[in-house]
């Protein structure tokens, strides 16, 4: 290839470009797409940097005011707000950049950020192959396309726009989006054998009449093109396509025989699946969906297609192929996740999918039930995605239809194995230290980015299983989301009976999400879709509860209960992660006060967590109660810093301003934030100072104080151990309301079964059965296990074999 040759070709007009980003920007102009919108004036832009400059100049006054409100100090406002002056290493500019990004609305989903680039690279490689052809062939192909386009555009202008009253789109744009939809189907190999056969069987007149007029097949593909281009009008076209598709589905010509009717039925099903797929793309990319679309029971419509297909799949020519079956499976699982309506039909449909060929002519069911026969490094990402989708369904079945699964089948083991598979897809990061600690190695290897939608679904499933296993005080009914349980657990110990469920898989997946949120280059507030926000909200609420209450002895948490958590190496990993994030990674930018904090916390972490020169359990009384000891001060400084970081870097930037949470949930998050800060400082009215033995719950009550409550409390002089964190001026708040705060999209619910009836059911979708209290954590040792105990072929990593 000659130097300087333009190797990136526009998929619309075949114009060549020398750089991929120039081609992508040019293609947006074809579709009229401006994905970046200013939250202040609602003006849209093609490029993010243009919008950032717009906010820093046009909305400068508003930006300065917002910055002053956020920092509480006008003197800290940067003098220059120009784009070229931003110093990414400055803490002030990082805050300003976060504020600017919070004013940007991006019509793209979290998962797309991580896997869209691979699709672009794949398309560019295909285009580079096309460049190798002679220019004469390119000109001939372009000429033929112009002739077909002109003929179709003329026919569409006369017939289609009149038939469907598409007043929001032109005939030219319809063809543009149609081509984008076709390209997407071809590149992703969706029903790849169906469309060549369909188009070859139609003449030009028939193509217009049958494909565009009598049935909205052409419009459905155009709707897919609009969805992937993030066009806001795609929801309007989707509603028109859906109503007309189902209106035409009952119109079979009586002259056709049974075989022709089956062919028409399969044709209808293919385009219905494409239509549902385009809706899923809209939901994942935060494209607003109208109330008229929300009224459709899409999951039931999808199952109405799949149920006869699974019963007589041999009669279907295209849908029965292996590749198409797994595409349909992924579509079905994702719509199930959004609808939460698993029923007997769902069980039947899933039974068909797990009997399909998965690897080496073996069905998926055999691969799962007989134990994975392949190591975690041998599976492709496509295979892992299928397994992750199936694990989510198995989790629902285990709760609702347990008799349908083998008695020895453990969903948790499958989740651990699949998480290990995704971890192995992560490139090995270079070591940043000559002598890294064991915790640093674990974080480097196991805290990963999200690889796909199915990877995020696996993280959700791991979290759902953990919440499902939590035991609340007095057997209180448990909701599936942690934040919905918060009014019940805010004043009680939550984890001391369930600390064994705080395992490495749970913690590393949680910290992976936290790590992505703390990385400003990963995504912004507007890039998070509702499902992302749901899980993030729950994880943040859980960690606020853990670090502000569960790890501090009080009237509700005894020292023995704290010790059960502190002997868990996974809790050590969390403490080390936050120590590394708050202090080590920012070591060059710490203020003088923060450096003093760092020195004390570093000694504590080295002595008790990294080297184990000192024992957390034997020194627990000093850590929890000795107000003047270095260990007490360092421990509480670390907990306070973690809570502050969760609040300032995640809760407020990402959750309080999220459009996907209702006002009640935001109010509860604010209460949780205030409660967490207050809980770290309030005096112990009834503090247990007795035995650390877990066998005794007898408490001798006395009055003590964790940190001074008064905002005017003077720090100790330099000759004594300082209280390095100034006490907060937070008013005591009333107990949090017991109202139930839920999301727009809930977690998996327990479906009322037709028969046999397993338990009493009601209207509350969050009601679940009480779980038997598991055995306590082994106080002597604990392992980071990366595999199930029953699977000898799985990779088993013992991270803390020497912790005693």
Curated annotation (Swiss-Prot):
Region spans: Disordered: 782-804
Main location: nucleus
GO molecular function, one term: DNA-binding transcription factor activity, RNA polymerase II-specific
Keywords: DNA-binding, Metal-binding, Nucleus, Repeat, Zinc, Zinc-finger
SUPFAM superfamilies xref list: beta-beta-alpha zinc fingers
One GO cellular component term noted in the UniProt record for this chain: nucleus
Zn finger limits (C2H2-type): 8-30, 36-59
Example GO biological process: regulation of transcription by RNA polymerase II
Subcellular location: Nucleus
Residue stretches spanning the membrane: none
Disulfide-bonded cysteines: none
UniProt feature, compositional bias: Polar residues: 782-796
Stretch forming the signal peptide: none
Name of the protein described by the UniProt record: Zinc finger protein YGR067C
Protein's organism: Saccharomyces cerevisiae (strain ATCC 204508 / S288c) (Baker's yeast)
Source taxonomy: Eukaryota, Fungi, Dikarya, Ascomycota, Saccharomycotina
């Amino acid at each position: 290839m000659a130097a300087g040759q333009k190797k990136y070709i526009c998929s619309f007009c075949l114009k060549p470009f020398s750089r991929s980003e120039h081609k992508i920007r040019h293609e947006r102009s074809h579709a009229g797409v401006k994905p970046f919108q200013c939250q202040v004036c609602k003006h849209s832009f093609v490029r993010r940097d243009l919008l950032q400059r717009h906010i820093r100049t046009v909305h400068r006054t508003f930006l300065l005011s917002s910055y002053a409100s956020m920092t509480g100090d006008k003197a800290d406002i940067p003098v220059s707000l120009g784009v070229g002056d931003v110093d990414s290493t400055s803490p002030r500019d990082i805050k300003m950049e976060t504020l600017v990004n919070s004013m940007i609305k991006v019509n793209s989903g979290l998962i797309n950020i991580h896997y869209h680039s691979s699709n672009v690279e794949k398309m560019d490689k295909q285009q580079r192959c096309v460049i190798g052809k002679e220019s004469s062939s390119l000109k001939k192909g372009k000429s033929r396309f112009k002739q077909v386009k002109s003929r179709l555009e003329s026919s569409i202008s006369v017939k289609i726009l009149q038939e469907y009253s598409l007043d929001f789109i032109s005939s030219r744009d319809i063809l543009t989006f149609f081509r984008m939809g076709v390209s997407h189907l071809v590149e992703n190999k969706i029903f790849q054998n169906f469309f060549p056969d369909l188009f070859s069987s139609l003449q030009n007149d028939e193509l217009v009449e049958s494909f565009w007029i009598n049935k909205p097949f052409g419009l459905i593909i155009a709707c897919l093109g609009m969805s992937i281009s993030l066009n806001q009008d795609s929801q309007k076209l989707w509603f028109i396509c859906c109503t007309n598709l189902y209106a035409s589905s009952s119109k079979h010509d009586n002259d056709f025989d049974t075989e022709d009717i089956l062919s028409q039925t399969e044709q209808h099903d293919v385009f219905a699946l494409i239509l549902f797929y385009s809706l899923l793309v809209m939901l994942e990319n935060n494209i607003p969906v109208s109330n008229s679309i929300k009224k459709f029971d899409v999951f039931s419509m999808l199952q109405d297609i799949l149920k006869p297909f699974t019963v007589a799949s041999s009669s279907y020519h295209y849908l029965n192929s292996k590749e198409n079956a797994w595409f349909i499976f992924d579509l079905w699982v994702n719509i199930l996740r959004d609808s939460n309506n698993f029923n007997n039909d769902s069980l039947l449909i899933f039974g068909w999918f797990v009997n399909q060929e998965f690897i080496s002519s073996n069905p998926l069911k055999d691969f799962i039930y007989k134990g994975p026969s392949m190591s975690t490094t041998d599976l492709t990402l496509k295979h892992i995605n299928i397994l992750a989708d199936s694990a989510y369904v198995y989790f629902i079945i285990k709760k609702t239809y347990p008799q349908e699964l083998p008695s020895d089948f453990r969903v948790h083991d499958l989740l651990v194995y699949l998480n290990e598979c995704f971890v192995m897809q992560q490139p090995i990061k270079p070591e940043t230290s000559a002598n890294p600690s064991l915790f640093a190695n674990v974080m480097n290897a196991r805290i990963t980015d999200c690889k796909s939608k199915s990877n995020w679904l696996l993280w959700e499933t791991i979290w759902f299983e953990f919440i499902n296993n939590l035991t609340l005080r007095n057997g209180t009914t448990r909701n599936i989301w942690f934040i919905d349980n918060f009014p019940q657990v805010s004043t009680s110990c939550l984890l001391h009976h369930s600390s064994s469920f705080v395992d490495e898989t749970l913690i590393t997946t949680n910290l992976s999400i936290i790590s992505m949120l703390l990385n400003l280059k990963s995504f912004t507030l507007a890039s998070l879709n509702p499902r992302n926000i749901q899980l993030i909200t729950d994880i943040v609420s859980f960690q606020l509860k853990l670090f502000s209450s569960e790890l501090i002895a009080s009237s509700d948490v005894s020292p023995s209960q704290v010790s059960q958590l502190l002997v868990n190496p996974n809790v050590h990993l969390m403490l080390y992660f936050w120590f590394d994030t708050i202090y080590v990674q920012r070591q060059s930018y710490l203020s003088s006060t923060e450096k003093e904090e760092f020195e004390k916390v570093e000694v504590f972490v080295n002595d008790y967590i990294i080297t184990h020169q000192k024992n957390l359990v034997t020194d627990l009384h000093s850590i929890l109660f000795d107000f003047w000891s270095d260990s007490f001060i360092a421990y509480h400084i670390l907990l306070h810093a973690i809570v502050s970081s969760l609040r300032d870097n995640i809760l407020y930037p990402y959750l309080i301003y999220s459009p996907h949470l209702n006002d009640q949930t935001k109010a509860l998050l604010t209460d949780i934030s205030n409660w967490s800060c207050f809980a770290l400082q309030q005096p112990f009215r009834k503090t247990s100072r007795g035995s650390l033995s877990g066998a005794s719950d007898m408490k001798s009550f006395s009055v003590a104080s964790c940190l001074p409550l008064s905002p005017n409390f003077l720090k100790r002089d330099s000759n004594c151990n300082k209280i390095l964190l100034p006490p907060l001026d937070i008013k005591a708040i009333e107990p949090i309301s017991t109202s139930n705060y839920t999301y727009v999209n809930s977690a998996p619910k327990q479906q009322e079964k037709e028969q046999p009836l397993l338990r009493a059911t009601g209207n509350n979708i969050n009601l679940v059965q009480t779980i038997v209290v598991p055995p306590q954590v082994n106080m002597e040792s604990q392992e980071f296990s990366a595999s199930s105990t029953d699977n000898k072929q799985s990779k088993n990593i013992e991270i803390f074999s020497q912790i005693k």
